[in-house]
Every structure is written in C-alpha cells, then in structure tokens.
Amino acid sequence: MKKNTDSEMDQRLGYKFLVPDPKAGVFYRPLHFQYVSYSNFILHRLHGILTVKRPLLSFKNNTERIMIEISNVKVTPPDYSPIIASIKGKSYDALATFTVNIFKEVMAKEGISITKISSYEGKDSHLIKIPLLIGYGNKNPLDTAKYLVPNVIGGVFINKQSVEKVGINLVEKITTWPKFRVVKPNSFTFSFSSVSPPNILPTRYRHYKISLDISQLEASNISSTKTFITVNIVLLSQYLSRVSLGFIRRSLSYDMPPEVVYLVNAIIDSAKRLTESITDFNIDTYINDLVEAEHVKQKSQLTINEFKYEMLHNFLPHMNYTPDQLKGFYMISLLRKFLYCIYYTSRYPDRDSMVCHRILTYGKYFETLAHDELENYIGNIRNDIMNNHKNRGTYAVNIHVLTTPGLNHAFSSLLSGKFKKSDGSYRTHPHYSWMQNISIPRSVGFYPDQVKISKMFSVRKYHPSQYLYFCSSDVPERGPQVGLVSQLSVLSSITNILTSEYLDLEKKICEYIRSYYKDDISYFETGFPITIENALVASLNPNMICDFVTDFRRRKRMGFFGNLEVGITLVRDHMNEIRINIGAGRLVRPFLVVDNGELMMDVCPELESRLDDMTFSDIQKEFPHVIEMVDIEQFTFSNVCESVQKFRMMSKDERKQYDLCDFPAEFRDGYVASSLVGINHNSGPRAILGCAQAKQAISCLSSDIRNKIDNGIHLMYPERPIVISKALETSKIAANCFGQHVTIALMSYKGINQEDGIIIKKQFIQRGGLDIVTAKKHQVEIPLENFNNKERDRSNAYSKLESNGLVRLNAFLESGDAMARNISSRTLEDDFARDNQISFDVSEKYTDMYKSRVERVQVELTDKVKVRVLTMKERRPILGDKFTTRTSQKGTVAYIADETELPYDENGITPDVIINSTSIFSRKTISMLIEVILTAAYSAKPYNNKGENRPVCFPSSNETSIDTYMQFAKQCYEHLNPKLTEKELSDKIFCEKILYDPETDKPYASKVFFGPIYYLRLRHLTQDKATVRCRGKKTKLIRQANEGRKRGGGIKFGEMERDCLIAHGAANTITEVLKDSEEDYQDVYICENCGDIAAQIKSINTCLRCSKLNLSPLLTKIDTTHVSKVFLTQMNARGVKVKLDFERRPPSFYKPLDKVDLKPSFLK
C-alpha cells in the first residue's frame, strides 16, 4: 500500500524480526523462546540435574558414609529436533533412564573401602517420560488396553497430554534487586536472595534481611533464619573485606546527598561505639563468638569448625567461588543502596518492577520440578535406609523406592495446571481460538496468591517497567484479574541459555574486564562496582564508566562475547553500579542504536538496498551497530527516544542524550492486539474490549478435530482477512483464519436493530455464513460392577446404547440420553421377598439443549471404566448469538430476515448484516469505517502492480493519517475505472450507496454506508446459555430453580423480575409464580400478641415467647410464601425481631349495618 522510503526503514527492520530466520534456527518467532527453553531442558539440562554423587548418611565422625550415585543418564529424544517437531505439530516424547548405585564408604588407614548396598539399572523406557510440547496423545492407535470406535489409524488424541496446556509464564518470586520495605516510621528492612549459579547442583538458596532502626543504630543487623548469624552489617562488611571503618565511611559517603551522608556517619559511629564497648575488641574473635553461640542455639551435630565453614563458605551462594574480600565489598554496595533508598524510595526499583524479576518459561517449569522431585527421590531412599537399619539392622533399600522417581507424576500435575505443591493452580489453555495458542504461552503473570494480595503487589497498575515490553491493550476488563498487564509485545521474548554457554560467557566477560589496567578496576572505595548476575567482580574508575559501557555495548553487538542478549546497565543516580546480566528468564527486545547522537540506521547507506534479501540475523552480523537486543533492566536505566520521527526533529545536542530509539507504535502491541485494526483511531476502551472479544472469536482450531477428544468450536468455512498487520501475518493467525467477510449496511431497520441488535440475512445463514461445528468431550468414570450390571426394566435413557453398554457411533444424543451403562444394585434385607435385588440407573445424562452426533468413543479399562465420548454438532447462527467486528462493535442477532425483506442496491445486492449506525458515533470506532473502505478498495484492485495478490496493511497501532488510506482507496478505484466523475469516485471511496426499499422499490432519501468487512462469531452461543424452563427441580431452602445447566437448572425469579410484573400490573401472575404453586405454598400460624411465628411441638402449634409468660394468645393461620418464612427465621437468628402485626379494620366489601333501636316505643 505504501512505498518503502527512508522514513519507514525502522518499520521494515521491525518486520525483519517478526519473520522466520532459519539461519539463526528461528522458524516461528512468537513461540521460539518456549521451544528453545523446552529443547534445552531435554537435550542438556535434564542430564546435568540427574547426574548426582553425594553422601546420604554419615557415621563415626564422617569416617563411614552411605553414598548415592546416579549415573549413566540416557535421554532418548526422537531423531528430529524438538523445535522442528513443535512447529510441525508432531508428538515429541523424550524418555530418560538412569542407573542408581548405593554403596558404603569406610575410611581406614589402608584407604577407602567400598561396599555395595544396592543397585538399580533403569531399563524401563517409561522411568521418566517427558510430556509432549505440541501434538496430542496416544502414539499407539491399536492399544489393546483401550477400546476405540472407530479404530482408525491415527488413534485418539487427548489434549491433556500436551505441554501446550500449561498456561502462562510465571514471574519468579525471588527478585534480582533487594526489596525495600518500611516496617514502621524510622524502621526499615532490605531483603535480598542469593541463588547459586546454574552449574552448581543442587541449587542453593539463601535469603537475608538487613534491618535498620533510626532509634537503635547499633542494631543495624543482617540475619538469615538458621543459615547465618545475626550480626552488625558494618562489622560483617569489615570482617569480610578486611578494611577499616574509615574506608567503609568514605565508600558509603561518596557521591551521596548530604542527608544520606549524615545517616552514614551516624551508622559508622554507632558501629565504632559497639567496638569500643567490648574490651580488647577483635573482629575475628567477635565473629567467632557469634558463630559459637549460633552453634549452641541450633544444637548442630557438626563440629564447631565444620559449622563455621558451612556457614561462612555458603554465605552468598551466588558468589560461591569469590574471595571473602569481594563479598565484603558487595555488602558495602548493598548497604549503600539501602541508605539511599530510605530517602529516595521512588527512584529505586520497587518489588512490582519487572526489572527485579525473572520469568519461568516452559523448560524452567520442568527444570524446577525435576530439581524438587529428585530431592524427594533421594530423601525417600535415605529414609528407607534409615528405617531398614532401625528395624532390621541392615543397610538396604526396597526396590519399589528405587523404581519410582516421581517425576512423571509431577509432570502430569503440571499439565493439569498445578505447578509445585505449595503454589496452587493457575489457568490452562482454553480451546476456542487458534489465537490463544500464541497469546497464552506469551502471557506473563504473577503467582495466584500474589495476585490476591493487592496490598503487597500493585499488579493492576501499568508499571513504568512494563512499557514497550508488554501490550497495554490486552488486559482483562473484569473479574479478579482486571487490569492485569500480562501479554508480551510482539518484539519481546524471554532469554534462554545453556549452563555451558553461561560459564563460557561469564569467563569471556571477566577476561574483558581484567584486560583493563589493574588500578582502574580496583576502585573499591569510590568506584562503580561491576557485577555479573549480582556477583561482584571489580570496581571501576568513575572517570571511565561511560567509555567502558559504550565499548562493552559495541563489542557485544559485534559478537565479541558470543551472545547478543547480554544486558549491561549503568545505574547512576548516586547508586553507582554497572550491572551485567547473562542469565535466563530476562525480557529482551530489539532497539535501534543511537551512538554519539547519530541514529546508526542512518549512517549505513547500503542497508536499505540490501534489506529485502537479508534476515534479522544477517543484519546483526553485517550491520551490527544498527540494532541491539536490550533487556528490561538496561532499558529502564537508559535514555530511549520513543520514535525515529521525534528523534530526527531534535537538535544535535538533544540527540546526544539518547542511547536507543524505539520502533513504530504497532510493535508495542501483543499478537492479540495486532489482530485488531487501527485502535489508535478509536476510543481507548475499544482496544481492551476488542482484545477480549478477539480471543473469544471462533477460529479454525485444528485439521484433525475428529481424532482429538477435546472441547472445541470450529469455524466451518473460514476466510483469511484482507486487512491485516504484519504481526498477524507472520504469526500465522491470519492464515489460520478467525472470521468471514460479510457485506454490512449501517442503517436502522424497522426499529429492530436497536442498541447491539443486528439483522442477519436468512440466505446468508443457509449458504453456510459464519457456520460452526461444536466438538464436545463427555467423560464419565463408572465402577466396573455397575458397568457390567444389566438393566431389569428397559429405560428410555439407554435407547442409544449398544449391547456392550456404550453409546452407538453416529447416534444423535438428546437431552436425557445416557452415554454409558451405569446401573447400581443393592440387596434388600427381606427374607420374605422373592427378589431382594433392586437396581436403579445412576448414569450421567447428556444435558445440552441441542442434538449432537456421536463421532468417537474411547474406553479405558482399569479398576474403573473411563469412557470418553466425542460429539459433534453443526450450529448455524440463531437469535441471540453474538458477533463482533475487529473494532469491538459487538452485536447480537435480533432478527433473521429473508432476502426479500432487505434493502438492495442498484445491482440487486442485499446486505448480509445490518448494524445500527449510531453505534459508530457512540463507541467512536472510526477504524471500522476505514476497514470497510480498505476492504472495498481491495475488491476493486486485489493485485499489486506486479500482478501478485496482496492484503492491505492496516496495523493495529499506526501513525498513518486517515487521508493516506483515503488516497490509497482513490488510486485503486481510478486504476479500475479512470473515467469516474468526482462525485462517483467519492461515493465509491466512502462506500456510500443508494439503497432501495424492498416494499416500495423506491430509493431511500439518504445514502447508506454499504461495504464488506471481516466479521467474527463469538463463542457466546444462545443454546449453551439458555436455562429457562417452566417446571423442574427447586432448591430446598428458597424454593427457587437450582443453578447449573448440567443439573437442569433454571433462572431464579428475583426482585427485578417481580418488579417487572408489578410494573405491568400482573398481580395474579406474581401470586401464581411466588405463592400459589404447591412447592411455594406455606401455612404459618402467627401469634397476635407478640407477632412471632408459632412453633410446632408434638403437632401442637405454640408461641414459645408467650407460653413462657403463661399467656394464652390467639394464633391466626395465614398463607404466605416459603421464602418469607425463611427470611423471618434468618433475621431472628441475627438478633433482628420482625413483628407481624394484624390490621384492625372492618371488612372492605360491606358497609356498616344500620343501628337498631330496641327501646319500647313509649320510651322514645
């Protein structure tokens, strides 16, 4: 639609990132990071986790040890790559086996003697079975343990076995920045976690807390429950770093505001007073005394030297092999941040900032579970050895303990949405839209309990750190997660790195840092600490920081370190730190590089001419300084210009202040938001509502729906959208389709299409317009004896079953039909009965309102009979079904009109859908009109000048003016018919047509907006929601219809329904519905003295209140509703007295009788 010019180079570069890049192994960009994460776990990480050699038990001062060794770990993946298998949708199933050896080591003078205790060589191919990434279910179609109808080649597929079901990427609870917290006025804490590097297994975790109370500065301590002593933070830093208190004072005070310097002096002085209060103070003796006290307190079995070594050696596991002196300098840098944060809290990354968090991808889920289950497995072996030694006096292990690692059960729980035992459940995949196959694996969310604790986590605010990396439009509009920003933007991805790559990268970076002059990287007193994954490695001369960071970034882009996703962050603002991040789980995305005030894209003249023939990896190799992969921490502490256009309008001095420049606005949306059109031309809420509706659109889910026993709704005749964005095309959402093109007219139709009502053409429905097929899984578990029982009295519910007790293939199920035989029987304890066996049907019935055809039946025979039935039903649009455009103009079918009832144009064409025209103005969806105009222009000229079919690019967010799109439409029509007059051309551009009244055949006075648009059918279907019924079950308490369609529920008749009938004056109807039916009628006796409801004691009605006072009141019988009685009883139980009083008045239908005077007449 638009020519590629120099001003659009940024857009073309952004598109290059989205398309596949086979040279770099990227075949599908949206989920590439998930594929790599999963592949790394199977091919590399699992082997390292399972390879273990460690002591289980030790005796006699560690001279005798029971050892466990897991070796010969063999992971058997298929012949093809996990990534290729994922894209092709093939079943990826990796199997792992290993050998366990348990032996006893005895240390003697002659040496170490080894005695074998037990051994298990895992030859079972299913010892550890890693589930599928993408692909469904049963590999063996002729499995004898399963009964299958029809038993065709291809088997039956159960979606539950796919990792695709897992759901969102969880944010790790451990933060990479310490968490600052105000406990109370003038009292603060600084909590941080230390996790060992990925090459150290099992992973060691330590959590520390620094406390500071202004009123008790001597108690400024660092502590960790059971893993470290409680000690003054300044003295600990001095002990580790071996420097004076003056050195620490100068280090903390350097480049700090005056108020922070004052607090630094106070803390150092308090530490000095603490040392002076102890006679002959020695820092080593002081720490040793604290360690000994902690040893006694914990009642440790270790010797004091072993205990001290264990505590101090494991202090700060992330700096495991680092000298104590660097650990001390690291503690000083932490204390520096802490003191600064007290005064300038808003400038420090808070706990909600994505800067502080790493993200768990699919491979990381499996890795975490493998760690946990391996520890459980080893723990079970240890306990079994101890129990056998205690009971039998021998070191032995039961074989069933060795053969059940427990990983398979943990992986199975993960696929059900359960991640770890302590973390609760989280949402898994629904199956309504193909778009959700992409959107959910790219969603980032907090743990469920973190979402609920709103006091701790303000996750419902659009945090500044989420800008550009997350989609601001695709957020829930209602429910418990309303406003939760979770969807990644199209350019964002999550880093993955192998352990070997991690160690090599760390080594290269350290070598580069140490290539600087020794004195320049040893400024530990007043320099900028350099950390790699929070581990301190050097401290840089403050005069060299800018040159160091600039040179590091240039070398990174040129591939000097062998990894283009390294993050380097220069933290200024008095915190003074250079942070280098290389680990997995970081959010990264590309940015355009600005170097010394120049946009590097502009200084590469060859780039534009060669760009069409290059992939993204080619650009990174041949033009390394044009684009840089930046993680979210580096972005937060960098100066980023929001657009190339804005950057070019700045002066040269202003440009030099920037480090990076962003891509156009369309790349800030997620893939769901990219399916919308022109959201920046509409009102803001339309984007949020549009994303929600797009995910509810019914699409073409799978080409193998007949073999996949799973719920799903599938569009029968999908069409590829004409108006699309590049992200929609590269993600294959457009190719998989999620709607159809229909002809709409914006007008009023006999007052029927008010509000959200739409008119739909009957012939359009009959031709298969927006027709769908519903696939539904019905699953029942039946006890084996019930399944084998025979029915004594023939039941209509079993009319669709075959002699084997299963529903017949191709049978049409109606409401009330059983899907499998389930007959329960009992024996009566009656010696005189001829037949003391009674049986009754307890089968689960088909409950849907519509008939469905049985497509497939599967049975698993174990201790219970598991029956799975797949039913299919074609469902055409009916009254009440929901539809929408891609601009959130939803509509509900209000009337299905015959073609003869609809207006027509000069060619006799009638609209498929009529939409209320006022909805455009009230919802401000201008882009809906633009979409119609562009789709109509495409129909006039569907090919470009080279004769190739081309869709129209109308991105979700764009800076293109509406006039540009109008000019494009004008050129299309002029190309088709150059002789059009200005008026005719204007009508065609703006899709205005004269329509004729079908009743009078006369033209309407005004022109009507009439044209094609991409229309979506939503999964909100009338027959799935309708619960209205005249008769049926009611609840015992309130005598209203029970809830739930599966239980035959109905709609409750509540206050609003009552008010409607009152407004219509239908008093008798209210009486009939709420009172006169036999279920609701209730006789109640009321005490006329106190107004209480009488109680029934031994069939005698008595007023309890009056009987205690020895009164004999009059009880009056009234008829009321059962609900009224329940209401009064519940109010009384809550201490609220409701008195029923009787009104004293004469009958309303008779006048008072005339008085009769009985006096004798002579007395009158």
UniProtKB/Swiss-Prot annotation:
Gene3D superfamilies: 2.40.50.150, 3.90.1100.10, DNA-directed RNA polymerase, subunit 2, domain 6, RNA polymerase alpha subunit dimerisation domain. It comes from the Viruses. InterPro entries: DNA-dir_RNA_pol_su2, DNA-dir_RNAP_su2_dom, DNA-dir_RNAP_su2_hyb_sf, RNA_pol_132_poxvirus, RNA_pol_bsu_CS, RNA_pol_Rpb2_3, RNA_pol_Rpb2_5, RNA_pol_Rpb2_7. GO terms for cellular component: DNA-directed RNA polymerase complex; virion component. Belongs to the RNA polymerase beta chain family. GO terms for molecular function: DNA binding; DNA-directed RNA polymerase activity; metal ion binding; ribonucleoside binding. The DNA-dependent RNA polymerase used for intermediate and late genes expression consists of eight subunits 147 kDa, 133 kDa, 35 kDa, 30 kDa, 22 kDa, 19 kDa, 18 kDa and 7 kDa totalling more than 500 kDa in mass. The same holoenzyme, with the addition of the transcription-specificity factor RAP94, is used for early gene expression. Disulfide bonds: none annotated. Its EC number is 2.7.7.6. PANTHER family: DNA-DIRECTED RNA POLYMERASE I SUBUNIT 2 (PTHR20856). It catalyses: RNA(n) + a ribonucleoside 5'-triphosphate = RNA(n+1) + diphosphate. It is an enzyme of class 2 (transferase). GO terms for biological process: DNA-templated transcription. It comes from Variola virus (isolate Human/India/Ind3/1967). The gene is OPG151. This is DNA-directed RNA polymerase 133 kDa polypeptide. It is found in: Virion. Keywords: DNA-directed RNA polymerase, Metal-binding, Nucleotidyltransferase, Phosphoprotein, Transcription, Transferase, Virion. Pfam families: RNA_pol_Rpb2_3, RNA_pol_Rpb2_5, RNA_pol_Rpb2_6, RNA_pol_Rpb2_7, rpo132. Part of the DNA-dependent RNA polymerase which catalyzes the transcription of viral DNA into RNA using the four ribonucleoside triphosphates as substrates. Responsible for the transcription of early, intermediate and late genes. DNA-dependent RNA polymerase associates with the early transcription factor (ETF), itself composed of OPG118 and OPG133, thereby allowing the early genes transcription. Late transcription, and probably also intermediate transcription, require newly synthesized RNA polymerase.
